Amino acid sequence: VEIFNYCESNGYRYSRYADDIYISSSDYLPIDVKDTLYKLLQKYTFGINFSKTGFHSRKSRRKVTGVVLTSNGELSIGFSERQKIKKMLYTYLVHENGEPRKILGYLAYLKDIEPQTYNRFITKYSSYCNTDVIDALQEKCKQDN
């Protein structure tokens, strides 16, 4: 609460997810503010990973807890994660090699973050199995039980 209050009273935004803490501002944090924040974090036994500490503008790629915030403010799973899902789908549907449950999990993640991309993938990859790709994966999961 003390860190949150300090940030709020100085015009900064404090966000936390598990052990990841984010201090957001429209500009670089002044040295005295950084020093105060470091002291507060240490007071509450938070370690600081300086390799993950930095300034990210709207022009740079911002990845927070595995989700990319694009320059236009949209959420994305990122190019490499999309490629991974494509590869898993193709490998499973064409070569029958892969883990259907894992693929379904990745597709659920994609659907939450990028629903339009999810719909494109479902349409595209359903043509590989002549049915709905989700139905095909779920059916395989039932058979494996």
What feature does the model see in each segment?
Residues 3, 7-26:
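Catalytic palm active-site di-aspartate
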